[in-house]
Amino acid sequence: MKLGVLLRNMGPQSTAATMAACARQAEAAGLDDLWVVDHLAIPPDEAEGSGGRYLDPLGTLAWLAGVTSRIGLGVTVLIAPYRPPLPTAKLVATVQELAAGRLQLGLGVGWMEAEFRALGVPRAKRGALTDELLAFLHNCFANDVVEANGQPFIFAPRPSRPPFLLGGKAEHAFPRILRHGDGWMPMTGDPEALREPVSRLRALFAEAGKPPPQVVPLTQLPLDDPPKARAQLAALEALGVTGIVYAERYADSAGFAPVVERLSALA
C-alpha cells in the first residue's frame, strides 16, 4: 500500500519556502506521494484555517515537479466542473510531462455553492460538466490530433495518461468511475465504512473486464499509536485499498517533519 501525505497548498503554510521544505522532507522520508487540494473562490465564512488563500493545484504540482525528483504528485480532488476542458487538458499534460509521469489526477464534481456562483457555473450541471471533461481528457491522451468546437488541433506534449481517481459518494461516483476512471478517492479511511463499497467497486470492475480499481482514501491515522495505525492500514489493504492520503494540520515545516517521520515508519 502506498503512503501519501497532504501538503497544505493553502493558508500560511503555502509559501514557496514552507512547501519546498515539506515536499523534500516527505521525499527524503520515503513516502510515496504528495497530494494537494483544490479551491478557487473561498467565501469569507468558509475561510477558517486558510484565510481564503489557496494556490492553484495544477500550478503547485508543476512547481513541485521541479522541487522533487521521485515522489508521486497528486490532487485530491480537482473540481472538474470549474475547469474548461481544453486548457485543463493542456495543464494536466504539462504537469505530467514536467513530472516525468508522476502525476495522479483526482477529480470530483464539487460541492461549495459559493464557488459555483463565483464561477458562474450552474451547480445542477456539475455531473454533466465532469463527464464532459473526463471524456475530453481521455480523447486527448489517446490521440495526437483532437477536435474541440469543430477545430482539429495537435495535442502535444502527449505524455502517458495519469490515473484518474474520482471522488464522491459510492452511489453517485461508481457509474462515473466505471465509465471514465481508474479508481476511487473516498473521504474516509474507516475499514468498516469502506468494506461494502470497495467490494462492490471491485466486483463492478471485474464484471467490466477492467483491472482492479485503485482505492485511495483521504484519512487520518493514530500516528501516536503505531500498532493501532498499522492494524488500520492492514485492514484497509485487505479490503483492496491501494494507498492513502494522510491529512493532518501543521503550522510549518518544523511541525510537518515529525508527521512524515511517523507516517513513513509505518511502511
Where are these regions (language model features)?
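Glycine-rich, proline-tolerant flexible connector loops at the mouths of alpha/beta enzymes
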Residues: D33-L58, I79, W111, T188-A193, ...
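An alpha-helical appendage that flanks or caps ligand/catalytic pockets
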Residues: E27-A28, D32, A124-S160, M185-A267
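Glycine-enriched alpha-helix->loop->beta-strand junction motifs that scaffold or abut catalytic
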Residues: V67-R70, A99, L178-M185, L239-G243
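N-terminal beta1-alpha1-beta2 module of alpha/beta enzyme domains
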Residues: M1-V67, P162, E261-A267
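Active-site mouth loops of central-metabolism enzymes
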Residues: V5-A17, T76-L86, R161-K169, V216-P227
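Short, acidic/polar
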Residues: S14-A26, T88-V92, L166-R176, D224-E237
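Internal, glycine-rich beta/alpha segment that forms the wall or movable "lid"
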Residues: I42-E48, A62, V75, P81-H180, ...
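Hydrophobic faces of well-ordered beta-strands that scaffold small-molecule active sites
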Residues: L3-L7, L34-V36, G72-V75, L103-L107, ...
